[in-house]
Amino acid sequence: MPHLTDDDIYYWRQGTHTHSYERMGAHPNQRGTWFGVWAPNADRVEVTGDFNDWRFGADVLDRREGGLWEGYVRGAQPGDKYKYHLRAGGEWFDRTDPYAFRMEPPAQNTYEGLSALITDLDTYTWGDDAWMTTREGPSGIDGPLSIYEVHLGSWRHEEHGASLSYREVAEPLADHVQNLGFTHVEFLPLAEHPYYGSWGYQILGYYAPTFRYGDPEGLMHLIDTLHQRGIGVIMDWVPGHFATDPQGLTYFDGSHLFEYEDPLMREHPDWGTRVFDFGKNGVRNFLLSNALFWMDKYHVDGLRVDAVASMLYRDYSREGDWSPNVHGGRENLGAISLLQDTNEHVYDEYPEAIMLAEESTAWPGVTTPTEHGGLGFLYKWNMGWMHDTLEYASKEPVHRKHHHGDLTWTLSWAFSENYTLPLSHDEVVHGKNSLWSKMPGDDWQKAANLRLLYAHMFGHPGKKLLFMGGEFGQHREWDHDRALEWDLADEPLHEGLMEWLGDLNHLYQNAPALWNDQEDGFEWIAYDDRENSVLTYRRLNGDRSLVFVLNFTPVVREDYRIGATGDGRWHERLNSDSDVYGGSNVGNRGAVHSDPVEKHGHSHSLSLTLPPLGALVLEPAE
């Protein structure tokens, strides 16, 4: 009896087979394994492996409609290595299974190229039932979302310098994230990638966790551990382009199957990778299924979609050397449709999922629902906020008054999409320096500036994201071959920075005023004090509010007045200059009472002492 049903073939040919991984690839049972592969240009497909001593001609697959091939091999069992042996145009070549659930480490290759391993993904016993039934709460758009971005291979190393495995990293990572109060971890791509220096963004095996850190059950254990600690997991996903390694997807069946046939569109000029042909139904099946695969089999809570702008524009980085769409335009209609369909199918099956877009242009409607013509993402990275805020924060305080608009004008578009504010890996590599090194001044001022930067990130509308190392102020920029500088975390200024970040996260998770990222959740009190480089704004959610007062100079400002809503006492919820965080302990002794002095359009005001390079978070007493 065939493994592929008539329905499978129908949905495959329509480009709507959203769980094609259940039919394609290798699927073992008690007596053997079913194999399925898409290779329409091939006139013969065989599977070779440990089970037939890698003999050509031993196990030939049957051709089905839609360019599909399938076959059953008795005796092929989990753990056996295998490859496809294809003939097209009179030539034979070998390919790794595009749907492989696991790939072997290259050092163990017994056959030219990278082999897949037959793998049963249903043997792991999950312990995250409580998380899976309640996760819609912490991931809702009206709730807190604070993400710790991690490159797993360089987060922490063993004593002899090796990266920690999925299992080894699970407990220490969960401890660290839980102690700091982040709601989610976002992993840079963990799908199989031959080139470690790509950070995972040049993928060969879209369905296989990279062998570098262990086996599939190891990754399941890591995610399970995080879930049991109440921490969500987001995976970086790269549906726009893929690695060119000859054993992978490139020229898979002797034709440009997964990539564009058009030479002007085929290669990505920035990364030297191949670009998926988003209009092909087989490619759409492959990518749509892959998005759901990570949620189905690995309990991933969401995907951060990489380089969306490079998918949306046919002329992206091509400087005039590109092919227009059927209407003569630059929009990539296939990519737009794929992204919309992916988001629709994800939210149909996982309404609580988090879909984030790294989209660096002003493309309209990234987070608008697809039924209203948008791409359908839940969040978009606010790249403009990241650029302008870091540009401002890196300037000497004496010059900041001349660049005051860099901070204020980000609010002019803050509500045009559902944004996430990313202080990401991209900002601490390639000569850009670490966040610590970007800050001006001596070590005390660098620490104070970073505390101030983080306060503004948590006060500004938008969800939060911080790349690893930023929590304690790593000195050197990130290097994927080296572990973080964990010894710094024990030094007073760096320890204080972590304490501050933890308290910001705690405040964020417990202050509904910070969850409302719509226009009615933000109110300027004073945005125009450029002479003193001070910003004052209020965050609101119903009758709950918090006031942020940010002093971007090292000058203590006495009797600094801000407008207040009525008569009453205000608590100093947080003060970044507290000695607990390594500051100079300048502040307002924990509280201040409003006076009947008009200011900023209010009948009452607060007389404050602003700490140097300091942030105050004030809350009205109940």
From Swiss-Prot:
<dbReference type="InterPro" id="IPR014756">
    <property type="entry name" value="Ig_E-set"/>
</dbReference>
<dbReference type="InterPro" id="IPR017853">
    <property type="entry name" value="Glycoside_hydrolase_SF"/>
</dbReference>
<comment type="pathway">
    <text>Glycan biosynthesis; glycogen biosynthesis.</text>
</comment>
<keyword id="KW-0320">Glycogen biosynthesis</keyword>
<dbReference type="InterPro" id="IPR013780">
    <property type="entry name" value="Glyco_hydro_b"/>
</dbReference>
<dbReference type="InterPro" id="IPR044143">
    <property type="entry name" value="GlgB_N_E_set_prok"/>
</dbReference>
<dbReference type="Pfam" id="PF00128">
    <property type="entry name" value="Alpha-amylase"/>
</dbReference>
<dbReference type="GO" id="GO:0005978">
    <property type="term" value="P:glycogen biosynthetic process"/>
</dbReference>
<dbReference type="InterPro" id="IPR004193">
    <property type="entry name" value="Glyco_hydro_13_N"/>
</dbReference>
<keyword id="KW-0808">Transferase</keyword>
<protein>
    <recommendedName>
        <fullName>1,4-alpha-glucan branching enzyme GlgB</fullName>
        <ecNumber>2.4.1.18</ecNumber>
    </recommendedName>
</protein>
<keyword id="KW-0321">Glycogen metabolism</keyword>
<dbReference type="GO" id="GO:0004553">
    <property type="term" value="F:hydrolase activity, hydrolyzing O-glycosyl compounds"/>
</dbReference>
<comment type="similarity">
    <text>Belongs to the glycosyl hydrolase 13 family. GlgB subfamily.</text>
</comment>
<comment type="subunit">
    <text>Monomer.</text>
</comment>
<keyword id="KW-0119">Carbohydrate metabolism</keyword>
<feature type="active site" description="Proton donor">
    <location>
        <position position="358"/>
    </location>
</feature>
<dbReference type="InterPro" id="IPR006047">
    <property type="entry name" value="Glyco_hydro_13_cat_dom"/>
</dbReference>
<dbReference type="GO" id="GO:0003844">
    <property type="term" value="F:1,4-alpha-glucan branching enzyme activity"/>
</dbReference>
<dbReference type="InterPro" id="IPR037439">
    <property type="entry name" value="Branching_enzy"/>
</dbReference>
<dbReference type="GO" id="GO:0005829">
    <property type="term" value="C:cytosol"/>
</dbReference>
<keyword id="KW-0328">Glycosyltransferase</keyword>
<dbReference type="Pfam" id="PF02922">
    <property type="entry name" value="CBM_48"/>
</dbReference>
<dbReference type="InterPro" id="IPR006407">
    <property type="entry name" value="GlgB"/>
</dbReference>
<feature type="active site" description="Nucleophile">
    <location>
        <position position="306"/>
    </location>
</feature>
<dbReference type="GO" id="GO:0043169">
    <property type="term" value="F:cation binding"/>
</dbReference>
<dbReference type="InterPro" id="IPR006048">
    <property type="entry name" value="A-amylase/branching_C"/>
</dbReference>
<dbReference type="InterPro" id="IPR013783">
    <property type="entry name" value="Ig-like_fold"/>
</dbReference>
<comment type="function">
    <text>Catalyzes the formation of the alpha-1,6-glucosidic linkages in glycogen by scission of a 1,4-alpha-linked oligosaccharide from growing alpha-1,4-glucan chains and the subsequent attachment of the oligosaccharide to the alpha-1,6 position.</text>
</comment>
<dbReference type="Pfam" id="PF02806">
    <property type="entry name" value="Alpha-amylase_C"/>
</dbReference>
<feature type="region of interest" description="Disordered">
    <location>
        <begin position="581"/>
        <end position="606"/>
    </location>
</feature>
